[in-house]
Amino acid sequence: MVTDSEYVNYDGKIVRSKKTAFAEGQRAAAIIGANLICGSMKTKEVTYNSKLIEFLNEFIDDFKIDLIYTHWDHDVHQDHSAIGKATLNAGRHIPRILMYRSNWYQTSDLFRGTYYVDISNVMDLKIRAVKAHATEYQKAGKGWIEFFKNENRNNGQEIGVRYAEVFEVIKYLNMIRRKP
């Protein structure tokens, strides 16, 4: 994550503290077997600039990244779109970049998902991981989960499985290795 995920509303009230956001992120990461790494940029203040690109470059170099999953660069959330755009720049030498829609709001651009992953056997884990973000879940309500279930079900119907995640492919180099 690029930000500390603290969320402050329009009147300055903290809706989700850094501590709470980190704890929720840790719980979600544990559910899916991932490690959570957080940046310190402020939520709603991320901009597409060289500072963000260099942050991502350092991350890519430090962790020897060869596959990137990033926010869709046309997401209406300003942080998400800035991160998506900056990732295209920072990931220019990475052989595989996939973008995803991370929220349920609409935009004037079409998401062009063409790479499907069957998540039928892990959909319950996805739901648990989303619900682990308790402050977001409380704010959005049960409709948030229903949206993801319906979207993943619709994606699955397109390819003949129960649930699927779909990504927009920026580039995807398949690497075939010779057997020794």
Residue ranges and their predicted role:
Residues 16, 84-88, 116:
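Glycine-rich, phosphate-binding/catalytic loops in enzymes
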